[in-house]
């Protein structure tokens, strides 16, 4: 999408007129500031007065004619089960009703809420049948009986208190005011002190009533005058500093009255303004190489097509949803089978509550909760490096896991702010109108209509993509109808949801081979589904699992079938069904592929008694559901075990991460990939000398910065506390140089590198022959397991697939701040002009290759390697590139110019495109010599010894047009580029 364009703009000053501004040069810096000058983070103060229905900001004006109901929510105030007249809001009795304040204030200035509350509930009704005032809520639809609740006060008659414990728990204490007579309240939420103070007006006197002190691990509620807390509530997780506000009632016998409502504070733009991707950093993940446990190697460069504009999405689940540690029991079919055989599986089948989670196996990251930020970050990195463009979040059951969704959006938005293009998001609201309406209503009220996280939405045809039935679309207001690109989506294209429209406007999320394509409303092929597995309850009559193919059926096996566990160690991990699906999708070659799926992991146990919905269905090709047979009355729909499941996220044990690398392989073949950049400007490095020697050396091998954060979170099931503090030295950039005698390795970390400690401190792994079948998982040498007298060890792996090493030599090293350099004589290792390498810190130490995924840091991530080569391979230029284009990318030291790829400055990889918003910065010499625009009179500054300018206005004055994409691409050409697909192709093609 085009987000900026400069064409023939009038300059504020003539860049040729040196009398208007003298050239300035700042002092050189060795620090990279990619963000450039920041604007203020906050908008103007917002004052909302419900009674007068006026506000200070135009977009928050409340219409006199507006009907305050949940079905037609206002951007600021909305009512559910109540009415408003003038400035008085009345919430209905004997129901659940609410008044929403749909504005979120920033976390540095006190927010103020003022209103008159009349709340009465005749005794002896339960305390929880009360009026609740919620603050710092994750969404405007959050309620005190939701797992994502933050802070809720209770008020009625002459009592005040807090929502405590599990719903419907609450604690109330006597107070000196009588809410049944109406009390004018002033609530001040100070996020800096982390205190919420409650006052009441005694006549015209503002009088303290109570305060809530918010600590990291608990809430402390004090009545005025109390020296110790009157109520204490422990916290599993810290309360956010800001959020939404809501007044909510639970089956009160009398109406609740709220009058003369005033709200004030400073709104934050941090989650509504798009992330500035001119601050981004490409890590060149499509040039990384890896081989999985069955010998499949990810293709690179000329083994794939040139990068294009195709898109790939994957089904993502957020239902791993406990609100506290130890809340749910663990049922794991594969763990049961491995410990007790098939009899243990039969014993487990009837256990647990109906509909509750039975895991098919343990995820590699454990039985995590979906709001575990450490896991969310790992998912973001993994999916981005795999080439996933978007996730489609499961909202098919009418349930939005509010805390989990907000955490995912916040963390991934933070990662985009850090410069990394993690996947965007759309929602699958299912094919049942009522359930889809429930999901859509929440999403619209809390996200889409507010502009919150707007840059996170995956766009199709220029609008956010969403899935819901056509019947729902017909009932929506015009604003919502025109906001989305919607498609109807469900399983099995042989069913009526697809066939009645001949597939037009229909995209399947599940189908059997050969899959039918998803079509546009006019009938063009748009999409195809790819599945890595199917269903436990029949798979469309085939009884097939991960090993099933249309061509060969279910593979032969030895021994007992055991629910398909007979294939666990043979074909379940080969991805036979996955490959057949992907091969067919690549043959059809649609613009977009959707993959089912990433992290479903469990299925509910169903059945029991008469009226069994699955009567007669076959479960895992093992038994037929029989409601009259106690053993066979239970059924599972989606997942059951290693054969009958459909997750690509790595598992613990079993086939580990095979499906992940198989997915990477196929995505690259479908979308294309760049060739590896050949080594350039190779020369001898004095590792005791100036680090500036490395600036000219290319290429940069990059890693994600920020992937060493600690983990501390409870599990979804099993009462585990997952902690991981192994992250230590965070790799950012690596380089290699060489001469006839030596190889030189450079590793730069985000902060100063720690002192040497243990055998896994700053290890360098080398695959000398680029062959995964030799050495330990392909690695032939391991450098720096020990250090002495300015030297590090050089060890060689003995044999294949073993963690046995022998010392073959030593190498010089230099540790300086955040940089480690190693100099190795070529005579020590048998290395040619092409080899693979990997850095790792505090990671693998005993031969478990999977530990690259979660221990310490590895560069590149997981099993991936960098490839060093001196072989010059022709860059695959995109067809969209024309001779008049200058194409630049945020954080890149390369550009397309004159129909080829060139450096911005031949002397340094530190010379990159930098910018913010529509302001971008380039080396002066590049602007004048390559773009052909004079920089005379422009302000200059020095970056790593390179003179920079901000050239946009000068370029426009020269008659050229600048197009800036939301990905962080800058194109200088004779005319603006409006086609988003062209911009995507150019972005993906440039290193």
Task: Describe the residue ranges of each PLM region.
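Short, aromatic/His-centered strand-loop micro-motif at the edge of beta-sheets
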Residues: 162-192, 204-209, 803-815
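Secretory/extracellular carbohydrate-interaction modules
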Residues: 87-170, 756-761
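Glycan-processing catalytic domains of CAZymes
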Residues: 272-686, 690, 698, 753, ...
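Short tryptophan-centered beta-strand motifs in secreted/extracellular beta-sheet-rich domains
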Residues: 180-200, 208-214, 221, 820-824
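Extracellular glycan-recognition surfaces and repeat-rich motifs
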Residues: 49-93, 696-727
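Surface-exposed, glycine/proline- and aromatic-rich loop segments on solvent-exposed faces
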Residues: 115-117, 123-145, 685-792, 843-850
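Acidic/polar low-complexity flexible segments
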Residues: 144, 223-242, 248-253, 677-688, ...
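Primary recognition of N-terminal secretory signal peptides and signal-anchoring hydrophobic helices
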Residues: 869-991
């Amino acid at each position: 999408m085009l987000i900026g364009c400069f064409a023939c703009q009038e300059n504020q000053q003539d860049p040729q007129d040196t009398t208007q501004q003298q050239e300035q040069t700042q002092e050189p810096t060795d620090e990279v500031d990619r963000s450039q000058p920041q604007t203020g983070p906050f908008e103007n103060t917002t004052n909302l007065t419900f009674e007068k229905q006026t506000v200070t900001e135009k977009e928050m004006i409340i219409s006199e004619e507006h009907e305050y109901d949940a079905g037609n929510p206002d951007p600021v105030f909305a009512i559910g089960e109540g009415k408003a007249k003038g400035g008085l809001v009345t919430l209905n009795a004997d129901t659940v009703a609410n008044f929403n304040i749909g504005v979120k204030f920033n976390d540095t200035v006190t927010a103020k809420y003022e209103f008159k509350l009349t709340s009465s509930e005749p005794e002896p009704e339960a305390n929880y049948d009360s009026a609740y005032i919620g603050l710092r809520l994750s969404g405007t639809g959050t309620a005190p009986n939701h797992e994502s609740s933050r802070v809720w006060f209770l008020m009625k008659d002459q009592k005040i208190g807090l929502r405590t414990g599990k719903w419907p728990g609450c604690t109330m204490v006597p107070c000196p005011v009588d809410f049944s007579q109406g009390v004018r309240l002033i609530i001040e939420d100070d996020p800096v002190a982390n205190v919420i103070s409650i006052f009441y007006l005694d006549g015209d006197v503002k009088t303290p009533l109570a305060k809530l002190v918010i600590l990291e691990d608990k809430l402390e509620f004090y009545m005025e005058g109390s020296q110790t807390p009157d109520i204490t509530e422990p916290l599993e997780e810290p309360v956010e500093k800001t959020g939404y506000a809501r007044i909510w009632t639970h089956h009160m016998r009398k109406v609740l009255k709220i009058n003369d409502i005033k709200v004030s504070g400073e709104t934050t733009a941090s989650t509504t303004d798009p992330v500035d991707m001119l601050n981004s950093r490409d890590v060149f993940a499509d040039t990384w190489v890896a081989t999985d446990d069955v010998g499949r190697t990810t293709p690179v460069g000329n083994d794939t097509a040139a990068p294009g504009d195709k898109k790939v999405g994957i089904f993502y689940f957020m239902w791993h949803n406990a609100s506290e540690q130890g809340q749910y029991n663990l049922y794991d079919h594969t763990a049961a089978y491995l410990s007790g055989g098939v009899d243990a599986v039969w014993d487990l089948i009837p256990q647990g509550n109906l509909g509750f989670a039975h895991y098919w196996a343990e995820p590699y990251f454990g039985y995590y909760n979906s709001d575990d930020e450490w896991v969310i970050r790992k998912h973001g990195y993994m999916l981005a490096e795999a080439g996933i463009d978007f996730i489609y979040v499961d909202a098919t059951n009418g349930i939005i896991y509010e805390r989990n969704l907000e955490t995912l959006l916040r963390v991934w938005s933070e990662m985009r702010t850090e410069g990394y293009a993690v996947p965007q998001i759309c929602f699958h609201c299912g094919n049942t109108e009522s359930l889809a309406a429930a999901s859509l209503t929440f999403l619209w009220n809390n996200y889409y209509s507010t502009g919150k996280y707007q840059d996170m939405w995956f766009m199709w045809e220029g609008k956010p993509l969403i899935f819901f039935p056509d019947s729902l679309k017909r009932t929506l207001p015009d604003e919502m109808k025109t906001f989305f690109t919607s498609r109807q989506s469900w399983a099995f294209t042989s069913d009526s949801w697809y066939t009645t429209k001949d597939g037009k406007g229909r995209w399947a999320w599940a189908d059997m081979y050969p899959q039918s394509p998803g079509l546009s409303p006019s009938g063009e092929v748009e999409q195809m589904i790819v599945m890595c597995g199917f269903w436990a309850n029949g798979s469309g009559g085939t009884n097939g699992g991960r090993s099933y193919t249309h061509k060969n059926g279910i593979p032969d096996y030895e021994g007992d079938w055991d629910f398909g566990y007979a294939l666990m160690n043979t074909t379940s991990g080969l991805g036979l069904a996955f490959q057949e699906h992907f091969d067919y999708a690549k043959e059809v070659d649609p613009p977009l592929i959707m993959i089912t799926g990433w992290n479903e992991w469990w299925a509910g146990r169903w059945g029991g008694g008469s009226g069994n919905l699955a009567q007669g269905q076959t479960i895992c090709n093992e038994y037929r559901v029989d409601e009259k047979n106690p053993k066979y009355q239970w059924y599972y729909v989606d997942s059951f075990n290693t054969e009958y499941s459909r997750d690509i996220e790595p598992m613990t044990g079993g086939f580990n991460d095979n499906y992940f690398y198989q997915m990477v392989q196929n995505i690259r073949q479908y979308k294309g990939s760049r060739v590896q950049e050949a080594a350039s400007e190779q020369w001898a490095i004095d590792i005791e000398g100036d680090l500036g020697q490395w600036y000219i050396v290319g290429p940069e091998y990059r890693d994600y910065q920020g992937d060493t954060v600690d983990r501390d979170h409870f599990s979804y099931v099993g009462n585990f506390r997952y902690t991981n503090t192994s992250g230590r030295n965070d790799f950012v950039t690596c380089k290699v140089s060489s001469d006839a005698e030596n190889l030189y390795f450079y590793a730069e970390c985000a902060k100063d590198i720690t002192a040497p400690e243990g055998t896994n401190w700053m290890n360098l792994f080398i695959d000398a022959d680029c062959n995964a079948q030799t050495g330990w998982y392909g690695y032939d040498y391991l450098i720096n397991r020990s250090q002495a007298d300015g030297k590090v060890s050089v060890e060689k792996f003995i044999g294949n697939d073993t963690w046995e090493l022998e010392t073959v030599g030593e190498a010089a090293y230099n540790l300086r701040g955040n940089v480690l350099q190693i100099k190795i004589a070529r005579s020590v290792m048998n290395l040619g002009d092409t080899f693979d390498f990997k850095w790792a810190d505090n990671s693998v130490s005993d031969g478990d290759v999977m530990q690259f995924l979660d221990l310490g840091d590895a560069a590149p991530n997981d099993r991936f390697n960098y490839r060093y080569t001196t072989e010059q391979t022709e860059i695959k230029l995109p067809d969209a590139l024309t001779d008049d284009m200058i194409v630049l990318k945020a954080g890149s030291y390369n550009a397309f110019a004159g129909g080829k790829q060139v450096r911005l400055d031949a002397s340094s990889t530190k010379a990159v495109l930098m910018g913010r918003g529509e302001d971008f910065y380039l080396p002066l010499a590049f602007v004048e010599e390559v773009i052909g625009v004079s920089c005379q009179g422009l302000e200059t500054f020095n970056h790593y010894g390179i003179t920079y300018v901000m050239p946009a206005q000068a370029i426009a004055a020269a008659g050229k047009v600048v197009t800036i994409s939301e990905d962080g691409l800058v194109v200088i050409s004779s005319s603006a580029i409006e086609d988003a697909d062209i911009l995507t192709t150019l972005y993906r093609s440039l290193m």
